[in-house]
Amino acid sequence: MTEPLLTMRGIVKAFDGVKALDGIDLTVRPGECVGLCGENGAGKSTLMKVLSGVYPHGTWDGEIRWEGAPLAASGVRDTERAGIVIIHQELMLVPELSVAENIFLGNEITLPGGRMNFAAMVQRAEELLRELRIDTINVAQPVMNYGGGHQQLIEIAKALNKHAKLLILDEPSSSLSASETRILLDIVRDLKRRGVACVYISHKLDEVAAVCDTVTVIRDGRHVATEPMATLTTDRIIAMMVGREIRDLYPREPHEIGDVVLDVRHVTCRDVTNARRKRVDDVSFSVRRGEIVGVAGLVGAGRTELMQAIFGAYPGACTASVTMNGKPLSIRSPADAIRAGIAMVPEDRKRHGIVPQLGVGHNITLAVLRRFAARGRIDAAAELDTIRTEMQRLSVRAAHPFLSIASLSGGNQQKAVLAKMLLTEPQVLILDEPTRGVDVGAKAEIYRLIFALAQRGVALIVVSSELPEVLGLADRVLVIGEGELRGDFVNQGLTQEQILGAALKPARLAAEPTAASAT
């Protein structure tokens, strides 16, 4: 067995006296891919920030050895010089710069006199992409011209340009399509063959099983186990992550489906940058009280834009006819939608769901502050009572209600956003990718909440790129393709193949909506 490239022993990191890491061990060998698994808040990101120098030596206890010698990094530059490079879940690219400029950002090739040698950077960037067998990216084009999948590949090329010996991938496929994920996994396998080690952090355990040689599981800041992937099953990994078995991920509860509460007709949205292009093209559907409607489709199909249009949040030109309980609505903003009884948990919680500068509690009450106002002042005691009640009801885990929401795990941030929207007492709740970047334990909690809301008569629209999630939750499934409604199916014996078939059909061949959506 080869000598370890990296050894972390007894890593302890505390914040305000509370241990986020409590004696964590991690070993990685050259050419090995180690899966790092744990629930949101388990300490995975904190451990990687220790390793990558975000938390410098001296701010944590324990030992890190790199290539057999102690590593005492004072910052990220030190670890990158050593060959440790992290690719964060939120990509660190500058959209306006070219692909080549991003690959060399902070590591530019210069000419005598200090001017940048753009020709050399373009040539080397092209070489790096060829090494990764990527031929679909023009290095002279701005990064903004490429989607999330290509941007992830650009980040990998950027890491290799820093001569990475250990590549840390933090939820690398969270915004990728299935085909883009396959390309990513092929690249990870190729890097392993070249001797590059990887730490692969993901809640998608099928990906962990596909590329990882060993798996390290941490829970509540402690090391649980490190075992060869060949000896593990996904159920076993989940049990180690959460400390219990999750037997029924989709606990379908009987719920009565009533009359139509929301009716949407002829939604059409124009592209923000090209008004001749339609992002949503004449979509009509309805949702009944207590019904869970899943919305499926390929990335870029227009699902999010459709939901934004209903919620009054679409940034471009949009036309639609919307009625609630038979009464016409005029929705020009999210505030109008909330007043009408429509709430939405957005796809990108960090940009549109939370205010990172505020605490957890103030994020939760943000949409209903008027409820606590009296004579121009906020009743802080009443607000705090509500915050504590909602945090307990949705199991939002935070040391105290005023802790910065930015410091919480993705799962706890998502539950805080849900709490905020539920305080508006909606009749219709739109959930756009509600479990993206959320661990399996938090997923189960969110699913239970969805079924509980349906039992209370709330109409739910759940947009998801995960077809098992759509099939596990929905009473009915809408399929969107190229901005059009390609299918409307009752979820009885429905398969993933049927959904994908509808999504991929050319518009003129797409099936007409079934009677499932008839009012």
Curated annotation (Swiss-Prot):
Residues 6-245, 262-507 form the ABC transporter domain. Belongs to the ABC transporter superfamily. Xylose importer (TC 3.A.1.2.4) family. This is Xylose import ATP-binding protein XylG. The complex is composed of two ATP-binding proteins (XylG), two transmembrane proteins (XylH) and a solute-binding protein (XylF). Its EC number is 7.5.2.10. The keyword Ribonucleoprotein does not apply. GO terms for cellular component: plasma membrane. It is a peripheral membrane protein. It is an enzyme of class 7 (translocase). The keyword Membrane applies.
